[in-house]
Every structure is written in C-alpha cells, then in structure tokens.
Design a protein with these regions (language model features):
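Hydrophobic membrane-insertion alpha-helices, especially the h-region
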Residues: 1-17
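Catalytic glycan-binding domains that act on GlcNAc-containing polysaccharides
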Residues: 16-232
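Extracytoplasmic/luminal low-complexity segments enriched in Pro/Gly and acidic/polar residues
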Residues: 233-238
Length: 238
C-alpha cells in the first residue's frame, strides 16, 4: 500500500513539473487569486492602459469589461486543472487550456495577435525592422504584462471584427453590434465570429464555446461594459 502511495505521489510530481514546463505561468498559482479585483479597482488600476490602446471597436470600457468578465482584472489569472481519461500520461491531469492572463489569451490567439499592435488607436501590422510605422519588438510581448495583454486583445479583436464585417458587406452596424461580434471572436474564435455575422449578428440559442453559453457571456460583457462606461463618465466629470 505504501508503495502505491509513493508511486502515485511521484507520478503527480512528475506530471506537475511537466505541466509547468509546458505552461510556466502555472508557477503563479500561489499568489494569483490575491490579484482579483472588483470593477472599480480594475478601472482605477488599468484605465490609462485601456484608454491608450482603445480603438473605435474596442473602447476603453469594453476592454475593461472583457478583463473583468474573463479574470476579475487579474493579470496573471490561470485556468483550472481537470482530469481527462486519455491514453497519454501527461494528458490525464492538466490545465484546462493554454489560456493565461487577464484576457485568458490562448497560445493560438497569442501567436496571431503578436503580429499586430496599436498605434494612435489604430491597428498596425508587423513589418520590416526598419519600418517605424509597423509593429516592432512584438516577440517580447507577454500575456501577463497588462499593457501587452490589452494591446494584443484590442488589436486582434479590432482587426478581426473589421475584416469580417467587410467580408460580408455589413454596413451601418452599431457600436454595440460590433462589440458583440468582437466578444464572440474573443470567446469562440474568428471562425465562430464569421458564423455569427452570417446569422445576422445573433447567437444561436443554446450555443456554447467551451464551458460558456454564448448568449449568457454576451450579456455579461454588455452589462459590464455599461458599468465601465459609467465609471469613465465619472472620471470625466471629476
């Protein structure tokens, strides 16, 4: 019996080391929970960053809302771990996804977003090293640095939202509709975003992306955006 306990403990330790090597941000878990914030704290702490990287689609309140809904404004938020009965040993118990940071950016999204940046509230693409109008030093970006995460998400969502609306010739779309499309892209990916546009900018009842009900998620982000709009208005009035 003791031998089985030792073997199980060793297996968990080996798996833990492997998962940390694959996703080093798991090392933040002892302190991660202490960085959660209420909306007012998120706005107070990061409003200058949200405003700096805002675009016509991803306004500062919208960027704040996504950060609050995804991770309570926690810059090093991590996903939960789960069991999965797969034949590969290191697949048995592992983080639920590669997502990390206040926007829970996955590896795939991170790879695409790093080709973009925000200059003067507009999306700019990666270019030659000597092109001062292009993005530069993007390879040094990190999902757990708030200013990097905000810029990456703002650029990625704005670029994909504008591209999809242009592709399907959707004109006269309101800001709320554009932000809802950006929310779907953030939650489900650009492919689901394209389907959302084809469906008339409406979510299919019961549609899920991962563990999230799309319609419920859209409602949460929209409500949180309204809250951050009020906080921004209070700043302007003071």
């Amino acid at each position: 019996m003791l031998g089985l306990v030792v073997l199980a403990t060793l297996a968990l330790a080996v798996n833990g080391v492997y998962q940390v090597l694959q996703k080093p941000t798991e090392l933040f878990f002892p302190v991660s929970g202490g960085l959660n914030k209420i909306p007012e704290e998120t706005w107070s702490r990061y409003a200058p960053i949200f405003k700096k990287h805002a675009t016509e689609v991803t306004t500062a309140p919208f960027l704040a809302a996504l950060a609050q809904v995804e991770a309570s404004g926690n810059p090093i938020a991590r996903t939960y771990w789960r069991w999965s009965w797969r034949p590969h040993f290191f697949e048995l118990y592992r983080p639920a996804s590669s997502a990390v940071g206040m926007y829970q950016i996955t590896d795939g999204t991170f790879a695409q977003a790093r080709q973009l940046c925000i200059h003067d509230h507009h999306v700019v693409r990666e270019g030659p090293w000597n092109d001062w109008h292009a993005c530069w030093m993007n390879d040094l970006y990190s999902r757990v640095i708030p200013s990097h995460a905000v810029e990456l998400v703002s650029a990625y969502l704005t670029a994909n939202t504008d591209e999809l609306l242009a592709r399907y010739h959707r004109n006269n779309v309101s800001l709320q509709q554009r932000q809802q499309l950006a929310t779907v892209i953030h939650l489900c990916g650009a492919g689901a975003g394209a389907a959302y546009v084809r469906q008339g900018l409406h979510a299919v009842p019961g549609q899920h992306c991962g563990d999230q009900d799309v319609a419920v998620y859209l409602g949460r982000v929209q409500a949180m955006t309204r809250l951050f709009n009020r906080l921004q208005a209070q700043d302007s009035a003071s």
